[in-house]
C-alpha cells in the first residue's frame, strides 16, 4: 500500500527477498528473438518495408515534396550565394593543406554538396573541404609522394613537374575514395555508433592540435620559404626548425600581405560575431579581401616585381575522372580509416547541434552513407576528402538557409567559378589563401579555453583533452588520433578498475542510504556493514573490489577463517586429552603448561584451513567472540551482517564470478551473513546459468533494496538494544512503517511485516 500525505509518503508492504518477490509476482514470459529471427526479419521484404528503405536512403524524397517555396526559397537563395562564395575561397585555401594546386579545391567544394543534397539528413550543414581533414590528407600525400623539387616548389605553380602534380592528386583522390568506401561500408552495416568512441573532449583536443598543424604548415606560404614536407612524428618541430633557419629568406611582400589579410579577417569576424543579431547577413570579408588582393596583385604585377607565389593556371571546366590506385589503398588503409571517422564525427556533431536547434531528426548511419558516397564521387573527380567546416555551415545557417536547397545553390556558385570565371583568380597570392585558411581557425584555436572548464567539471575529460592535443602535436594527426582513442579507452578502464567504493549508512531514519562520510547524522545498525560498488565487476577490478571490501569491514575473512580452523585443531587436541572443560562461564583448561606446536599447525595444508568450520564432533559450541582456552587467541569481530549494494553493477564476467563467490564463502564461513541488493532479474539469471550458487551461496541472499535487507536483519537478530526494537516487545510481532519524521519505529496501530524466505 502506498499512501501520499502532503509532502510525505507512507509505504506498507512485506519485506521481500528477490526470491520471494518472484514467487509472489510471476513474471511474464517474453520471447527473445534469436539470431535466425533477426536474420529472417532483415531478409524479408514487403512493399511498406521497401518504401521505408527507399525513403531512408534518399531523404530528399521526404522533405522536397513538403518544401515551402514562398517561405523558404528566398532565404535559401541568399544563403546559397553567401555559402557558395565562402566555399570557393575555402576550397582554394584548403587545397594548399593537401599540397596540391588550389584549383583542385574547387572540385572538393562542388561534388560533395551535390551528392549530399540527395542523401543527407541534415538541412543546415555545408559539406566540403574541412581544414583538419585537408591536413590529414596532406600528411598522407607528403608521406607517399617524394618531392623532387622541394626547393623550388614555392616559386610558381608552373615550375612544378606535371607528373609530380598528377601523382600527388592521384594519392589525394585515392585516399579520399578509400575513406568514402569505409564510411559507406560502416553506414550500410549500421555501425554509426563508432562515433561514440570519439568523445567531445577528444574531438576538441584533436581539432585544436590540427589547427596548430595547419598554422605551422601555412607559414611556408605566408613567408614563401622553401620548407621540405615532413610526415613522420615530430614533423611539426622539423617544419618550425626549417622555417626559423631560413627566416632571413622571407618574402616581405608575402609577409605584409598575409599579416594585413589576417588582421582584417579576424577583426571583421569578431564584428560578425558580436553584431550578428543586427546584421542581416555576415560581412563577407573573405570575399572582399580576395577581390581586393587579386586586383592589387594583378594591377601592381606582384609576381614579377616582388617574386610572390600566385595561384597560377586555373584551367576552366572539369577534368576527366580517374581510377583510384590500389597500391595507394594498401599503403593508406590506416590513414583512410582515421580520415573517415574524424570526418563523420565532425559532420555528425555539427548536424546534431542544428537538428536540436530546429527540432528535426538526423540518422547517423545515413549520414555515413551520404558522406561516403560524397567522398567517393569527389575522389573520382580529383577532389579531396571533406566533411563540414564549422564556419561555412554557420554562414549557411545564419544567412537564413532552411534546407539543402541552399547547399545546392552554393554548388552552383562553385560551378560558375569552375567553368567560367576561375581564371580571374590566377594573380591571387598563395599567401592570401594561407591567411584566409588561418582566419578560419579562430574557433578551433579558441578551444584552448576548454582546458579550464573541463578541469572544473571532470578531471578525466580534461586529461583526455590535454593528452589528445599532445599526441596529435608530437606524433602527427594519424598516429595521434589512434593514440588518443587508446588513451581515452584506457581512462574508461581505469575508472572501472578503480571505482570509488563507499560504505553506506541510514540517513534521516527512513529508507534512504547514503555515503556515511558525507553526512553528520547517520544511523548504522550495530554489526551491520553496507558496502556499495559503483561500477561493473570484472576480471580487472575483482581484486580491487575485494581489497576495498576488506578495508571497509576492517578484517580479512580468510585470515579469520584460517585462524579459527587452527584454533579448532588446538581445541580438539585439548578435548581429546581431557585437558579442557566447558562450563557456563566458559572454557576451563586443566593444564596451564600445555603448548602445541605452531610449526605443526603451520605445516598443515592451506586447503584444510580454508574449509568451513565444523564443530559437530565437539560436545559443546564455541563462541569465537568469547573467552577461549589459554594460548589460543584469535581476532574478535563484531560484524554479523554484510550488505553489498550492487545497484550500479551492470555486469559480472566469469572470472569475477569465481572471485565473488570465493569472497562470499569466506564471510559465510565465519558466520557473517551476506546480502546482495539492487540487482535486476537478468543479473541473477546469468549467475544461475553460470552455476554461481551452491550449498553455501544461495539465491536467498538477494533482496530488492537495502531497506528490505536491513529490516530482515533486524528481525532475524532481534536486537535487545537496537532503537528499532524494544526489549519490552519481544513477545509480540514486530511491525514497521516508514515515516520521514520519526523514521523506522514501532507503533501500536501497524501493518504487519511479512518476512518471506
From Swiss-Prot:
Keyword Transport: yes
Transmembrane as UniProt keyword: yes
Protein family per UniProt: Belongs to the SLC26A/SulP transporter (TC 2.A.53) family.
GO cellular component: apical plasma membrane; brush border membrane; membrane; plasma membrane; sperm midpiece
Domain of life: Eukaryota
InterPro entries: S04_transporter_CS (IPR018045), SLC26A/SulP_dom (IPR011547), SLC26A/SulP_fam (IPR001902), STAS_dom (IPR002645), STAS_dom_sf (IPR036513)
Gene: Slc26a3
Tissue: Expressed in spermatogenic cells. Expressed at high levels in cecum and colon and at lower levels in small intestine.
Post-translational modification: N-glycosylation is required for efficient cell surface expression, and protection from proteolytic degradation.
Glycan-carrying positions: 149, 161
Topological region Cytoplasmic: 1-71, 115-124, 198-201, 272-278, 357-367, 426-462
UniProt-recorded name of the protein: Chloride anion exchanger
Motif PDZ-binding location, chain numbering: 754-757
Catalytic activity: hydrogencarbonate(in) + 2 chloride(out) = hydrogencarbonate(out) + 2 chloride(in)
Entry GO MF terms: bicarbonate transmembrane transporter activity; chloride transmembrane transporter activity; chloride:bicarbonate antiporter activity; secondary active sulfate transmembrane transporter activity
Keywords: Antiport, Cell membrane, Chloride, Glycoprotein, Membrane, Transmembrane, Transmembrane helix, Transport
Entry-linked Gene3D superfamilies: STAS domain
Compartments, as annotated in UniProt: Apical cell membrane; Membrane; Cell membrane
Xref: Pfam families: STAS, Sulfate_transp
Topology of the protein relative to the lipid bilayer: Multi-pass membrane protein
Quaternary context: Interacts with PDZK1. Interacts with CFTR, SLC26A6 and NHERF1. Interacts (via PDZ-binding motif) with NHERF4 (via the third PDZ domain). This interaction leads to decreased expression of SLC26A3 on the cell membrane resulting in its reduced exchanger activity.
Transmembrane domains' residue ranges: 72-92, 94-114, 125-145, 177-197, 202-222, 251-271, 279-299, 336-356, 368-388, 405-425, 463-483
Predominant cellular place of this UniProt entry's protein: membrane
Annotated STAS domain residues: 518-713
Family matches, as SUPFAM superfamilies: SpoIIaa-like
Record topology, Extracellular segments: 93, 146-176, 223-250, 300-335, 389-404, 484-757
Amino acid at each position: 500500500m502506498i499512501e501520499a500525505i502532503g509532502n510525505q509518503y507512507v509505504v506498507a508492504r512485506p519485506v521481500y527477498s528477490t526470491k520471494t518477490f518472484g514467487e509472489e509476482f510471476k513474471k511474464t514470459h517474453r520471447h527473445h528473438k534469436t539470431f535466425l529471427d533477426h536474420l529472417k526479419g532483415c531478409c524479408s521484404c514487403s512493399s511498406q518495408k521497401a518504401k521505408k528503405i527507399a525513403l531512408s536512403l534518399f531523404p530528399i524524397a521526404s522533405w522536397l515534396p513538403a518544401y515551402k517555396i514562398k517561405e523558404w526559397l528566398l532565404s535559401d537563395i541568399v544563403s546559397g550565394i553567401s555559402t557558395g562564395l565562402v566555399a570557393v575561397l575555402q576550397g582554394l585555401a584548403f587545397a594548399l593543406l593537401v599540397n596540391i594546386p588550389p584549383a583542385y579545391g574547387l572540385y572538393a567544394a562542388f561534388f560533395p554538396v551535390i551528392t549530399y543534397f540527395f542523401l543527407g539528413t541534415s538541412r543546415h550543414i555545408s559539406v566540403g573541404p574541412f581544414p583538419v581533414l585537408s591536413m590529414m590528407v596532406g600528411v598522407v600525400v607528403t608521406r607517399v609522394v617524394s618531392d623532387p623539387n622541394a626547393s623550388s616548389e614555392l616559386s610558381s605553380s608552373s615550375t612544378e613537374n606535371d607528373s609530380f602534380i598528377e601523382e600527388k592528386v592521384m594519392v589525394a583522390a585515392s585516399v579520399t575514395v578509400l575513406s568514402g568506401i569505409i564510411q559507406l561500408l560502416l553506414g550500410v552495416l549500421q555501425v554509426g555508433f563508432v562515433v561514440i568512441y570519439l568523445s567531445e573532449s577528444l574531438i576538441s583536443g584533436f581539432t585544436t592540435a590540427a589547427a596548430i598543424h595547419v598554422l605551422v604548415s601555412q607559414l611556408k606560404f605566408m613567408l614563401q620559404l622553401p620548407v621540405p614536407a615532413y610526415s613522420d612524428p615530430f614533423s611539426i618541430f622539423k617544419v618550425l626548425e626549417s622555417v626559423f633557419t631560413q627566416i632571413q629568406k622571407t618574402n616581405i611582400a608575402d609577409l605584409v600581405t598575409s599579416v594585413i589579410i589576417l588582421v582584417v579577417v579576424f577583426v571583421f569576424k569578431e564584428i560578425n560575431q558580436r553584431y550578428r543579431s543586427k546584421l542581416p547577413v555576415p560581412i563577407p570579408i573573405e570575399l572582399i579581401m580576395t577581390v581586393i588582393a587579386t586586383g592589387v596583385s594583378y594591377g601592381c604585377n606582384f609576381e614579377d616585381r616582388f617574386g610572390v607565389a600566385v595561384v597560377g593556371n586555373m584551367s576552366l571546366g572539369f577534368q576527366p575522372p580517374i581510377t583510384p590506385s590500389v597500391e595507394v589503398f594498401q599503403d593508406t588503409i590506416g590513414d583512410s580509416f582515421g580520415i573517415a571517422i574524424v570526418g563523420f564525427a565532425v559532420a555528425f556533431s555539427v548536424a546534431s547541434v542544428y537538428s536540436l536547434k530546429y527540432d528535426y531528426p538526423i540518422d547517423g548511419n545515413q549520414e555515413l552513407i551520404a558522406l561516403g558516397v560524397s567522398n567517393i564521387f569527389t575522389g573520382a573527380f580529383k577532389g579531396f576528402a571533406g566533411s563540414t567546416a564549422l564556419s561555412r555551415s554557420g554562414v549557411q545557417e545564419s544567412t537564413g538557409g532552411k534546407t539543402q536547397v541552399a547547399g545546392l545553390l552554393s554548388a552552383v556558385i562553385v560551378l560558375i567559378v569552375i567553368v567560367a570565371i576561375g581564371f580571374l583568380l590566377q594573380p591571387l597570392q598563395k599567401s592570401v589563401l594561407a591567411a584566409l585558411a588561418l582566419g578560419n581557425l579562430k574557433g578551433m584555436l579558441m578551444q584552448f579555453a576548454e582546458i579550464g572548464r573541463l578541469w572544473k567539471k571532470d578531471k578525466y575529460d580534461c586529461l583526455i583533452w590535454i593528452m589528445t592535443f599532445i599526441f596529435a602535436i608530437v606524433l602527427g594527426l594519424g598516429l595521434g588520433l589512434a593514440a588518443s582513442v587508446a588513451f581515452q579507452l584506457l581512462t574508461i578502464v581505469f575508472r572501472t578498475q578503480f571505482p570509488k567504493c563507499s560504505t553506506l549508512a541510514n540517513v534521516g531514519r527512513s529508507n534512504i542510504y547514503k555515503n556515511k562520510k558525507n553526512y553528520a547524522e547517520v544511523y548504522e545498525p550495530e554489526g551491520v556493514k553496507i558496502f556499495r560498488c559503483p561500477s561493473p565487476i570484472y576480471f580487472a577490478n575483482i581484486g580491487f573490489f575485494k581489497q576495498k571490501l576488506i578495508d571497509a569491514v576492517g578484517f580479512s575473512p580468510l585470515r579469520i577463517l584460517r585462524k579459527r580452523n587452527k584454533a579448532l585443531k588446538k581445541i580438539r587436541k585439548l578435548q581429546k586429552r581431557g585437558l579442557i572443560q566447558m562450563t557456563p562461564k566458559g572454557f576451563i583448561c586443566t593444564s596451564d603448561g600445555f603448548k602445541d606446536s605452531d610449526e605443526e599447525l603451520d605445516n598443515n595444508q592451506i586447503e584444510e584451513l580454508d574449509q568451513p568450520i565444523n564443530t559437530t564432533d565437539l560436545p559443546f559450541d564455541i563462541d569465537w567472540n568469547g573467552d577461549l582456552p589459554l594460548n589460543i587467541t584469535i581476532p574478535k569481530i563484531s560484524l554479523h551482517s554484510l550488505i553489498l549494494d550492487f545497484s550500479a553493477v551492470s555486469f559480472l564476467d566469469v572470472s569475477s564470478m569465481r572471485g565473488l563467490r570465493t569472497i562470499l564463502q569466506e564471510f559465510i564461513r565465519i558466520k557473517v551473513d551476506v546480502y546482495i541488493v539492487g540487482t535486476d532479474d537478468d543479473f541473477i539469471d546469468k549467475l544461475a546459468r553460470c552455476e554461481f550458487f551452491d550449498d553455501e551461496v544461495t539465491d536467498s541472499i538477494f533482496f530488492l533494496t537495502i531497506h528490505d535487507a536491513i529490516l530482515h536483519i533486524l528481525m532475524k537478530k532481534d536486537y535487545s538494544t537496537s532503537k528499532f526494537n524494544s526489549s519490552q516487545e519481544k513477545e509480540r510481532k514486530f511491525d514497521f512503517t516508514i515515516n520521514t519524521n520519526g523514521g523506522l519505529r514501532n507503533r501500536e496501530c501497524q501493518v504487519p511485516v511479512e518476512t518471506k524466505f
